[in-house]
Amino acid sequence: MEEVKKDVYSVWALPDEESEPRFKKLMEALRSEFTGPRFVPHVTVAVSAYLTADEAKKMFESACDGLKAYTATVDRVSTGTFFFQCVFLLLQTTPEVMEAGEHCKNHFNCSTTTPYMPHLSLLYAELTEEEKKNAQEKAYTLDSSLDGLSFRLNRLALCKTDTEDKTLETWETVAVCNLNP
């Protein structure tokens, strides 16, 4: 019997068409100075264990069904301790944002002990603390009105995301759904 291929999938909430270009421009500018792979602006709402493509699509469809578009607000530009959380926009943990994360986590049977930290990554990179601080300052120089910025997340994307691949070349968007207003 042939073994069915299983992959790690992520569910991303995508910013609306109005705010996406602003984030892309900021990400592009940071990447040109500090290097790092290109990726679309997104807020990760769930990461699965290994799933087959069929399992992932079914879970994704059911997650999309029960979720409405929602608003997120930037708390501040922050830095993290690993590659995929190098420099990011930390989002306010409003009930709306936290419920969206919980909703998707439940549909994907995510059993994580880490509390949900909603954020929109600006840069994936291996930087020193000094470089991260510089990138953080640069983000504010490029866009001084980030703190308190509110934007809509109106789509979900199902993505195959092998976290071992730091080039992101194997990352693939499998499906996108528009959320009800």
Swiss-Prot record:
<dbReference type="InterPro" id="IPR009097">
    <property type="entry name" value="Cyclic_Pdiesterase"/>
</dbReference>
<dbReference type="GO" id="GO:0005737">
    <property type="term" value="C:cytoplasm"/>
</dbReference>
<dbReference type="Pfam" id="PF07823">
    <property type="entry name" value="CPDase"/>
</dbReference>
<feature type="active site" description="Proton donor/acceptor">
    <location>
        <position position="119"/>
    </location>
</feature>
<keyword id="KW-0378">Hydrolase</keyword>
<feature type="binding site">
    <location>
        <position position="44"/>
    </location>
    <ligand>
        <name>substrate</name>
    </ligand>
</feature>
<keyword id="KW-0963">Cytoplasm</keyword>
<feature type="binding site">
    <location>
        <position position="121"/>
    </location>
    <ligand>
        <name>substrate</name>
    </ligand>
</feature>
<comment type="similarity">
    <text>Belongs to the 2H phosphoesterase superfamily. CPD1 family.</text>
</comment>
<dbReference type="GO" id="GO:0005829">
    <property type="term" value="C:cytosol"/>
</dbReference>
<comment type="function">
    <text>Hydrolyzes ADP-ribose 1'',2''-cyclic phosphate (Appr&gt;1) that is produced during tRNA splicing into ADP-ribose 1''-phosphate (Appr-1''p). Also acts on nucleoside 2',3'-cyclic phosphates.</text>
</comment>
<dbReference type="InterPro" id="IPR012386">
    <property type="entry name" value="Cyclic-nucl_3Pdiesterase"/>
</dbReference>
<dbReference type="GO" id="GO:0004112">
    <property type="term" value="F:cyclic-nucleotide phosphodiesterase activity"/>
</dbReference>
<feature type="disulfide bond">
    <location>
        <begin position="64"/>
        <end position="177"/>
    </location>
</feature>
<feature type="binding site">
    <location>
        <position position="124"/>
    </location>
    <ligand>
        <name>substrate</name>
    </ligand>
</feature>
<keyword id="KW-1015">Disulfide bond</keyword>
<protein>
    <recommendedName>
        <fullName>Cyclic phosphodiesterase</fullName>
        <ecNumber>3.1.4.37</ecNumber>
    </recommendedName>
</protein>
<feature type="active site" description="Proton donor/acceptor">
    <location>
        <position position="42"/>
    </location>
</feature>
<dbReference type="GO" id="GO:0006388">
    <property type="term" value="P:tRNA splicing, via endonucleolytic cleavage and ligation"/>
</dbReference>
<feature type="disulfide bond">
    <location>
        <begin position="104"/>
        <end position="110"/>
    </location>
</feature>
